[in-house]
UniProtKB/Swiss-Prot annotation:
InterPro entries in the record: Carb-bd-like_fold, CarboxyPept-like_regulatory, Ig-like_fold, NOMO-like_N, NOMO1-3_2nd, NOMO1-like_9th, NOMO_12th, NOMO_3rd
Keyword Hydrolase: no
Disordered: annotated segments: 1198-1222
Quaternary context: Component of the back of Sec61 (BOS) complex, composed of NCLN/Nicalin, NOMO (NOMO1, NOMO2 or NOMO3) and TMEM147. The BOS complex is part of the multi-pass translocon (MPT) complex, composed of three subcomplexes, the GEL complex (composed of RAB5IF/OPTI and TMCO1), the BOS complex (composed of NCLN/Nicalin, NOMO and TMEM147) and the PAT complex (composed of WDR83OS/Asterix and CCDC47). The MPT complex associates with the SEC61 complex. Due to the strong similarity between NOMO1, NOMO2 and NOMO3, similar interaction pattern probably occur for the three gene copies.
Topology Extracellular: residue spans: 32-1155
MF-aspect GO terms: carbohydrate binding; ribosome binding
Protein topology in the membrane: Single-pass type I membrane protein
PANTHER family xref list: BOS COMPLEX SUBUNIT NOMO1-RELATED, CARBOXYPEPTIDASE REGULATORY REGION-CONTAINING
Modified residues (Phosphoserine): S1205
Organism of origin: Homo sapiens (Human)
Segments of skewed composition (Basic residues): 1213-1222
Signal peptide: 1-31
The protein's name: BOS complex subunit NOMO1
Pfam family, one: NOMO_6th
Amino acid sequence: MLVGQGAGPLGPAVVTAAVVLLLSGVGPAHGSEDIVVGCGGFVKSDVEINYSLIEIKLYTKHGTLKYQTDCAPNNGYFMIPLYDKGDFILKIEPPLGWSFEPTTVELHVDGVSDICTKGGDINFVFTGFSVNGKVLSKGQPLGPAGVQVSLRNTGTEAKIQSTVTQPGGKFAFFKVLPGDYEILATHPTWALKEASTTVRVTNSNANAASPLIVAGYNVSGSVRSDGEPMKGVKFLLFSSLVTKEDVLGCNVSPVPGFQPQDESLVYLCYTVSREDGSFSFYSLPSGGYTVIPFYRGERITFDVAPSRLDFTVEHDSLKIEPVFHVMGFSVTGRVLNGPEGDGVPEAVVTLNNQIKVKTKADGSFRLENITTGTYTIHAQKEHLYFETVTIKIAPNTPQLADIIATGFSVCGQISIIRFPDTVKQMNKYKVVLSSQDKDKSLVTVETDAHGSFCFKAKPGTYKVQVMVPEAETRAGLTLKPQTFPLTVTNRPMMDVAFVQFLASVSGKVSCLDTCGDLLVTLQSLSRQGEKRSLQLSGKVNAMTFTFDNVLPGKYKISIMHEDWCWKNKSLEVEVLEDDMSAVEFRQTGYMLRCSLSHAITLEFYQDGNGRENVGIYNLSKGVNRFCLSKPGVYKVTPRSCHRFEQAFYTYDTSSPSILTLTAIRHHVLGTITTDKMMDVTVTIKSSIDSEPALVLGPLKSVQELRREQQLAEIEARRQEREKNGNEEGEERMTKPPVQEMVDELQGPFSYDFSYWARSGEKITVTPSSKELLFYPPSMEAVVSGESCPGKLIEIHGKAGLFLEGQIHPELEGVEIVISEKGASSPLITVFTDDKGAYSVGPLHSDLEYTVTSQKEGYVLTAVEGTIGDFKAYALAGVSFEIKAEDDQPLPGVLLSLSGGLFRSNLLTQDNGILTFSNLSPGQYYFKPMMKEFRFEPSSQMIEVQEGQNLKITITGYRTAYSCYGTVSSLNGEPEQGVAMEAVGQNDCSIYGEDTVTDEEGKFRLRGLLPGCVYHVQLKAEGNDHIERALPHHRVIEVGNNDIDDVNIIVFRQINQFDLSGNVITSSEYLPTLWVKLYKSENLDNPIQTVSLGQSLFFHFPPLLRDGENYVVLLDSTLPRSQYDYILPQVSFTAVGYHKHITLIFNPTRKLPEQDIAQGSYIALPLTLLVLLAGYNHDKLIPLLLQLTSRLQGVRALGQAASDNSGPEDAKRQAKKQKTRRT
């Protein structure tokens, strides 16, 4: 289908055309019609670009070029005709460096729902040019990779793009729009001499104004001695090409004591190795260098290998290899119990876990035969602790630093007299040592079975605490003291001790009147089931109680009397390390229980008492409990936004019960706010069928009600004055009357209304007015009844908006379309009157509207500075006459016309004429397109004036031809959907065309070039249902005419594979033979088995032609103990339609044992062997017994294998031997 589209450049007045044209094939009639699909769109750009440099190309999904075209130079419009359905790729091919999004579009043309059939635009948007540049090494033609390069607008700091350089130093930015930019280079380690440059992008790709320069690269290495890093080794840098000025971050002063050996090298600078043995030169330009190590100790200069190393810096950082090594004394030390402390005797000092020495009485020790390096030294002494130190030993360090004790043992004992009964006795406990220094962490150890423990502690102040398990703590096990403070100085602490503790709990009960019988309970909070009770009794208002022998822990002490109020009905206490006293229970009143469906306020007073007994309670939903200070009968009244079943309730303290209040309705409020005082009516509809619709109104605004109240008050005061005047006499009436004024009514105006709703009721509130519009028009609210609904409805009313306009000059019948901004469909459509005027309203004033106009034959544009006024212009037209070179009309030509926002793609009819009317004045670009033809002019820009009608003649010349044919099955049935192709041969091998047969099996291959030979054949893809074609291809040679009757017969795929075979063997073995079929990946389970019986031939049921690998194996029941035979097997692949297999089975019978008489031939040798064995029987008999035993085992194994061989043996052969394929 070809979709023609049009849109006027000055507005929507131009009629949009959408046509579907069925066009017979050009040339001889072949009884089929070709559906032409136009795929078009725009190359779009917000900046000026040369559209003529851009090509749009259509490829098949396999990469064959189907069509190419250029763009309209005025607006970038393009159109590509398609003559076949299928999958294609549309590509934009701009000049190198230009960027577009997207670059390719995949098309699936089905003639129904694809973008081309629907007439949609395929647009390519220009995103920018490319900017190229280089980062070079100083003095070099190339540069490094990995430099970060950023692009930003000149004068700003924000980065637009970032990239990194490629090998050689090149970099590029893409999608850069015209403007002035700054390019900056950065690198985390390299120094840059020129770190920024500029570039100006106009209407093409641009190059950076100058290259960016890297001043140098960091070079590093390392030095070690016996595997340990060496500090303080100097590395001197020399070069014959690089100057000192080019080297950065390096000490250029001479090195004392160094004598150069090579006068050809120029000294540049030196660096010194660090703690970790590493050294580095911060910035060295590209070039050749020599580094020489130099190391002098306090008393000696050491050799360093290698003594000299040459290296070259290219365009990257360099790690110098190999590692430098310093090549090759007694040292003494002391072990002390603290800084400036005493020596520790008999301490064992270990060097690198190998050399061990003991300290003398003064704590000193001596290490001999030490080479330069870093060592680990560790000292050991009972109850003293030392840290392992790592120290660097060199000739200039003969005296080691003192080894100071860092910690001492802190030991103690836990004594438990009686274990609680509710837990199992434990033998071990965790003990925590915590320092007074908050920055230090806790140390935890575990006691032994006797309760002893020890810590390792540094000098300082500490406290020790036993961690009693939670179960034991709940059971009441407590130790004293809770913490043991101590101070560690320079010796171990061995006297820490903890012992067990018990306690008592006592208290008092105070009553408002006589206490009577009360029960006090003590219940452990941490030990379930441990509960003790005391029964108290007395006719006094105060009593005491005591619980003895209480284990430490948390307890709950409770007093039992449900109908009384207590200051504390229960108390939680914790027995730690002291006795517990001063526990008190005090009665405060009498309990009232109230069950509420909602949170409300209750007002109550006591019958027969004064106002001082009235109380107010704010209660929550659910069961509430509160206390009444005196007994009696109370009247309870609910106050809330809810209506209850009763207006008030009564409660008697002498008959305690639960007071239940259930709400049945809930107060809903609403407000309507308007900017004008108008008639407002509210309709409330309920979701409950039994509730009728409620109409409220006309409502009075709050301002009106306030005014009426003021008027009523003024009138009352006036009447009061008149009354007073009549009483006071005539002189009072001579005074002037008092004038009172009411407030003027000013908006906004509020209209309040309310409604009592049931729980779960859904109400719909709809306001109405003659001149107001409401926002929203109606509101719904669901009253859950869980809480006060409050103001659920808020609606605003506003005066309507009217839109008016005029057409200049006056023009009747112009269609005016009013739409809400962003809406897909128009809101209101009207036509101008005989004066060219219109008026629309009322409309919602808080919305934005768009006003458009259109009239056939006119372009209407909005008048600047007005809202809704338009100017009208008469339209122009263009007529195209397209002829063949024989001057005959040429139908079926796709003509694309575009200009501004207008575009149209139409096919010529039998007369070859196309007319475009209703065109706005301006420039247009046209391009005729038809496969197998070229046109003169091929494309052209034309200027159309207002009201002008142009006539343009176009001539088409035939450049290629078509091949027509059919594809059918052997019985003549047409084959639909077969993919065909024409493949060029010899010099035309780069050309090719493809198509698909229609429902009649017909096909047309277009665009075949004269003088070329093609093979017309089935495509390799898309024909999975076809097995083969007859012939495989047809050879055609294209002249100056179309080619007809290229017919091909195809055979559909058959998915069956037949397998048969025969066995060559003697007929006597046939009853013992089976033929088995296996899949090659599973030789354990046959998928089919066939018995031969009395026939030498066999046939398996049909297999699937699935390309799988199979194995056919012959199996026999002949006993291996009597026959020798090989079971043949053949492997094959299920390809094709049939397979015949021949198997050969030729068993041989085993020979019987030989007669004894034949033994006479070996009698003499056997006699000699017996005599020899007699002389050596002591050695030979054990050997013969062992040999006989082995031979019997081998024979038994062989017999078992022979008797049980058969199918399993054949399977093993099939797995181990390589199969024979046929």
